[in-house]
């Protein structure tokens, strides 16, 4: 397939799961993975792409899990939001060490730690080629960081949400459990809903669908995959109308 000389996206929203940062450790943040991700984001900035990043917090804390053990779900979700801020701080630090200008914003005020989220300020920073890391989810309990990614993607007028996962794309079945599972190159929103494919939770997915925000699922553990996605090469699964 011919490679495009120019990126196919001008502004992206990159959704990283907290689990993606933990590497093989099973918990916490793997510094080498963090640095590799920072380098891959740096490549995009050098291509002139405006990058917004939403990070999950599952490597540090899962509110839903503790809610099952009896903790109040709202409290658990607030702790989960703080976990995403911790990941955001780590990512901002990794980007700064890679000589990339980055700003961390939080949906819940944390004065002295990071900036409060402002839609206008985020867009202004993106236009000036700053990487904007958007943490603390939506700022509300009961919403996942996938919902935050779609919400922020719509707000900052991103061309696409790039959902970085541990698998190469969206499959007919879980490839870890079913070796015969095949990957889709492209799907429509309605196909995902009809086939009940696990792309993201329903609240997040329907938000993207209603605002015609394309989603591309790809494997962040595959070196160079992010660059291939933005250059329009065959990588991952694209979900559109």
Swiss-Prot record:
Main location: cytoplasm
Gene3D superfamilies for this protein: Acetylglutamate kinase-like
Sequence segments annotated as region (Involved in allosteric activation by GTP): 23-28
Keyword entries, A-Z: Allosteric enzyme, ATP-binding, Cytoplasm, Kinase, Nucleotide-binding, Pyrimidine biosynthesis, Transferase
Superkingdom of this protein's organism: Bacteria
MF-aspect GO terms: ATP binding; UMP kinase activity
Recorded GO CC terms: cytosol
Organism listed in the record: Salmonella typhimurium (strain LT2 / SGSC1412 / ATCC 700720)
Name of this protein: Uridylate kinase
Family matches, as InterPro entries: AceGlu_kinase-like_sf (IPR036393), Asp/Glu/Uridylate_kinase (IPR001048), Uridylate_kinase (IPR011817), Uridylate_kinase_bac (IPR015963)
Inhibition and activation profile: Allosterically activated by GTP. Probably inhibited by UTP.
Entry EC no(s): 2.7.4.22
Keyword Chaperone: no
Residues forming coiled coils: none
GO biological process, one term: 'de novo' CTP biosynthetic process
Record: residues binding UMP: 57, 77, 138-145
């Amino acid at each position: 397939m011919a490679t495009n000389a120019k990126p196919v996206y001008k502004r992206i929203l990159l959704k990283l799961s907290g689990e993606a940062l933990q590497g093989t450790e099973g918990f916490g943040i793997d510094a080498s993975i963090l640095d590799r991700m920072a380098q891959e984001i740096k490549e995009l900035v050098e291509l002139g792409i405006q990058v917004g990043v939403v990070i999950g917090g599952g490597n540090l804390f899962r509110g839903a899990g503790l809610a099952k053990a009896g903790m109040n779900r709202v409290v658990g979700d607030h702790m989960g939001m703080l976990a995403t801020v911790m990941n955001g701080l780590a990512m901002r630090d990794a980007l700064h060490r890679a000589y990339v200008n980055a700003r961390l914003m939080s949906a819940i005020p944390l004065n002295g730690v990071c900036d409060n989220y402002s839609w206008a300020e985020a867009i202004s920073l993106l236009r000036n080629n700053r990487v904007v890391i958007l943490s603390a989810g939506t700022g509300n309990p009961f919403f996942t960081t996938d919902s935050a990614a779609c919400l922020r993607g719509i707000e900052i007028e991103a061309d696409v949400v790039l959902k970085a996962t541990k698998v190469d794309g969206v499959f007919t079945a879980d490839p870890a459990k079913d070796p015969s599972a095949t990957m889709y190159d492209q799907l429509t929103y309605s196909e995902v809903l009809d086939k009940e494919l696990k792309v993201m939770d329903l609240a997040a997915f329907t938000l993207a669908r209603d605002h015609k925000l394309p989603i591309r699922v790809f494997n962040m553990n595959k070196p160079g995959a992010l660059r291939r996605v933005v250059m329009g090469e065959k990588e991952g699964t694209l979900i559109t109308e």
